[in-house]
Every structure is written in structure tokens, then in C-alpha cells.
């Protein structure tokens, strides 16, 4: 009986120490991971809106993001959301437009999260990816210039995906064999456009 109790006590101590060690390692790695994610996001923001010197979150935009969730879902862009909105500013503080982070859960493998730049004149400055895990050689081609650069300079209007050559100024040519991904990216972009056009300043 004493042997059993001793073994149980030893096992308990080992488990406790292991748990504490794992917890400590987790806490130690959290900060570097967060910093790496922030650095990657900042790099994407600059690629999407290169003219901007800085990006600023405001209470007004944060409130608009929260208030517009149901309205955006009702627009028929798919299962999309606007996750974040920032003002894109020049060096002198003048407003150049907005940097919008939006998501769709309708990629072939689920979540696709993008950042979209939209100027005050109503044009897209570019599109970048914050999260995407689509099929290599198919959906992951969304990150290739042939697909994502189609959005550069487009008018901020409702966009549509076409499987053939884009013939209208609101059409995005789908990635061959990756229609789900193409529609997810375009749906998230439409959510970002709708947000800026209809929810900012309400």
C-alpha cells in the first residue's frame, strides 16, 4: 500500500513539474510569435497600400466593424466578415484611404483572410494575404501576381468571378481549378469594398 502511495506521489510530482514547464515554454513563446505575426501583417499592409506612411485604428472604425457584421453577411458575398479597419495616412497625416482586413470561410480548405487597400477616390490599391492554406499548385496560386494583381487599380465596386477572360471592369478571372478560392478572395474583397462604401461614417 505504501509503495502504491509513493508511486502515485512521484507520478503526481512529475506531472506537475512537466505541466509547469510546458506552461512556462508556452508563455515564453507567445511574445515572439505575436511579434512575428505583427511584423508579417505590417509588411503585407505596406505591400497593399505602398503610398501610405502609417495606418491608424480609430474608435469610429472599430465601432463600424462591430456594427456592420450582420449587414455585410446579408449582402450575398458568402460567409464573409470585415475583421479590422484602419485609416491609411500620408507622412503629413492626410487621409489616403482605408486598409481593410476581411475574411471568407469559403475557401476550399476554409479560412482565407486578406487585406485590401481602398483609396479615398474609390480605387483598390492592392490585395495581400494574412491567412491562406489552400491546395498547393491550385488555390495557393491566389498569392501569385497573375491572380492577385488583377485587383490593383480596380474601381471599388461589386466584383464578380469569371472562369473565362475578364471582359468587364468588375470581373476577376478565376484561378484554373480553384474556383472556391477565387470566389472566397473576391467575396472577402467585396465585403471590404461594401464596408468602406456603406458603413464608414454612418
What are these regions (language model features)?
Residues 2-202:
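Flexible, solvent-exposed loop/hinge segments and secondary-structure transition points
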Amino acid at each position: 500500500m505504501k509503495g502504491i502511495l509513493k508511486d502515485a506521489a512521484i507520478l503526481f510530482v512529475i506531472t506537475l513539474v512537466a505541466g509547469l514547464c510546458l506552461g512556462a515554454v508556452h508563455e515564453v513563446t507567445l511574445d515572439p510569435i505575436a511579434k512575428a505575426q505583427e511584423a508579417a501583417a505590417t509588411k503585407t499592409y505596406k505591400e497593399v497600400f505602398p503610398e501610405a506612411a502609417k495606418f491608424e485604428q480609430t474608435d469610429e472604425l472599430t465601432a463600424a466593424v462591430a456594427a456592420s457584421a450582420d449587414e455585410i453577411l446579408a449582402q450575398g458575398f458568402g460567409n464573409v466578415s470585415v475583421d479590422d479597419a484602419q485609416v491609411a495616412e500620408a507622412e503629413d497625416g492626410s487621409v489616403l484611404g482605408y486598409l481593410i482586413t476581411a475574411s471568407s470561410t469559403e475557401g476550399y480548405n476554409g479560412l482565407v483572410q486578406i487585406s485590401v487597400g481602398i483609396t479615398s477616390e474609390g480605387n483598390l490599391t492592392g490585395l495581400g494575404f494574412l491567412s491562406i492554406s489552400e491546395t498547393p499548385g491550385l488555390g495557393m496560386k491566389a498569392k501569385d501576381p497573375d491572380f492577385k494583381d488583377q485587383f490593383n487599380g480596380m474601381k471599388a465596386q461589386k466584383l464578380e468571378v469569371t472562369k473565362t477572360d475578364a471582359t468587364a471592369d468588375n470581373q476577376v478571372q478565376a484561378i484554373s481549378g480553384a474556383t472556391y478560392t477565387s470566389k472566397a478572395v473576391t467575396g472577402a474583397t467585396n465585403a471590404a469594398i461594401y464596408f468602406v462604401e456603406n458603413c464608414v461614417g454612418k
